[in-house]
Amino acid sequence: MGRFSRSWDLVEQSFAILWADKQLMFFPVLSGISCVIVTLLLGVSGLAIFLPAIRAAGITAQNFPHFAKSPEFAGAMFVFYLANYFVIVFFNVALVGVANSRLTGGNWTFDQGLQLAWTRKWVILQWAFVAATVGMVLRALSERAGFIGRMVIGIIGVAWNIACYFVVPVLAFEDVSPGAALYRSAELFTETWGERVVGGFSLGLVFFVLMIPGFALWFAAVRLWGAAGAVAGGVVMGAYMLLLSVMSSAVQGIFNAALYRYACDKEVPAGFSRDLIQGAWAPKD
């Protein structure tokens, strides 16, 4: 089975669970809205704090890149990363909690998912601090490195993402610290699929293909109705893309919960095929 075919089947199986429990889509919606609100609040606060200093220092668009390397700007960006990481992980924990309930025959409600995330809020905040720190460090190193250095940092980033793959469900279901969650996540992954692996699926690729009809609709509207079609088609395409984004986030959360259950219990959750779950990651030749 090819990588795209495998990915398509995984999306279908995950979507079947989403279709049976549509409340799962509310978590990505709330996550997105919360991130927008947090970004706006931080942006307004940042302007209020830094604008007088920016004016006093005579910072313009031409010399802003120099200001962007200052400790003050780095601190502001860290707060931005921290806040958004917290929001994203918080709602992902809630999503994985409800998805896990569905996979194991339970019937958790939306509120129960939020309650789970709320009980984990402090460890989620601690993990957000760790993730924001690593993200900032990798970003800073990448900006200062040459071509080879960026390749090495990219490899480190991939290894970090794999090690973190099960951090969200571990935070949700196991009473551990952020460091222990990272260790447990990496342990589950390597014990189940090995240390050197390649992805046997790409949910992002499937949703990229699903985006094509949205662009096609917009181009068709422009060709048929000109400027009016561009506006109307843009509205429809935007709504379609938002729906795909919500569905993509929900499907990824469901699949993450399914793989976590398999990694813990070595039993394939109901609704998923054994071959697809076992082959989600393959040993690297």
Predicted regions mapped to residue ranges:
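Hydrophobic alpha-helical membrane segments
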Residues: 1-285
